[in-house]
């Protein structure tokens, strides 16, 4: 089974695009840092491709973060929801 097919039932979400923006890295710069094509970074960000464990670890090393901070099986909470919690039902 291909990784994308497995991903239909077990998705892998990531924060690569957000982290790239925070670190002011282009797709090309991140691709060069982890030794892959720029198109691979785009496919990862869109969820069209899932990284090997080795690639996931190389990406995490670039950002200095543990793997669970960059990749997860459940969707990440939007940063805006963490920074600006909903005030519904509050006076």
Spans of model-derived segments:
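A short, Lys/Arg-rich alpha-helix, primarily the initiator
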Residues: 1-22
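Short alpha-helical DNA-recognition segment
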Residues: 24-43
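Generic structural marker for isolated residues within well-ordered, non-membrane alpha-helices
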Residues: 16, 27, 56
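Residue-level detection of the helix-turn-helix DNA-binding "recognition helix"
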Residues: 21, 35, 46, 75
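DNA major-groove recognition helix of helix-turn-helix/homeodomain DNA-binding modules
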Residues: 54-69
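Alpha-helical residues within the helix-turn-helix
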Residues: 21, 32, 61
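Short, charged recognition helix plus adjacent turn
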Residues: 2, 6, 61, 71-91
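The DNA-contacting recognition helix of HTH DNA-binding domains
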Residues: 27, 38, 48-49, 67
């Amino acid at each position: 089974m291909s990784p994308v097919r497995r991903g239909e039932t077990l998705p892998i979400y990531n924060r690569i695009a957000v982290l790239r923006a925070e670190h002011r890295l282009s797709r090309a710069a991140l691709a060069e840092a982890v030794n892959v094509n720029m198109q691979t970074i785009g496919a990862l960000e869109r969820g069209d491709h899932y990284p090997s464990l080795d690639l996931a670890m190389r990406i995490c090393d670039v950002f200095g973060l543990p793997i669970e901070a960059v990749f997860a099986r459940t969707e990440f909470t939007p940063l805006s929801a963490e920074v600006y919690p909903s005030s519904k039902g509050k006076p």
